[in-house]
Amino acid sequence: MIRQNALHHAEKCRFCWMCRHLCPVQHQTGKELNTPRAKGLLLSMVNKKAQTFDKDMAEAMYECLLCDACTNDCATGYQPPLFIREARTEAVVSEVAPESVMKLIENVETTGNIYGVEKPSYGRDGTDVVVYIGEVAAIKVPEMAKHLLALLAKAGVSAKVLANEPASGVMLGDLMGYTEEVRKQAEVCAKTLNETGLPVVVLDSYDAEIMTQKYPEWGCEIAAGVTTATAFVARLLEEKKLAAKA
């Protein structure tokens, strides 16, 4: 069941074309189905009993990056990812989500990441900040993590990294919406980070987004604050603790 607030956004978006030029998926495929308007129209039809939520519709809801380009450009404040994410919850609950998606969900539930592999550990002690590496950087672009830690060391920042870093919930939340399983992941992650007593520097902006926007809503706010790695390094540059090469 899609909540009334999400349906309200869908009903408004189904009349509007103003963000169709911003969707990267629609640009790539050329399909009207990939515009936020079309997805809003589909859910409106389901709500009015004019269409059933079937596998084809579920697949359409997964043809979205949840990048928020549409939301950021909306002059009236509507949020297509809100109803698209809830449509994904409906797809999973109704057992019409694509098999490939269900496999990724299984991977996240067993390993904490969509790749289905053991996450490398970057564990180290530190006293100034705790760096949250995240799943993508740890597994797919480890050089990003290594370079960030090297920069912090050069700036004299004592950075702690958890030996067993919990999943933030962002991957599962993107795949199946903000369900109870996602909130439980968030609670575990927030509790673990809060136990360090240190401010959190987050390497992946997607992890930072869920930590700053959803964790407080779910009652598991990170007490010492969250900063993205880019913002933290920018501050170090401003404070002359790092110098950019010409």
Give the label of every model feature segment.
Residues M1-I2, G197, A246:
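Intrinsic structural disorder
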Residues M1-M61:
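Ferredoxin-type iron-sulfur electron-transfer modules and their immediate structural context
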Residues K119-G126, E238-A246:
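Short boundary motifs at domain starts and secondary-structure transition points
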Residues C220-K245:
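Short, flexible loop segments at boundaries between secondary-structure elements
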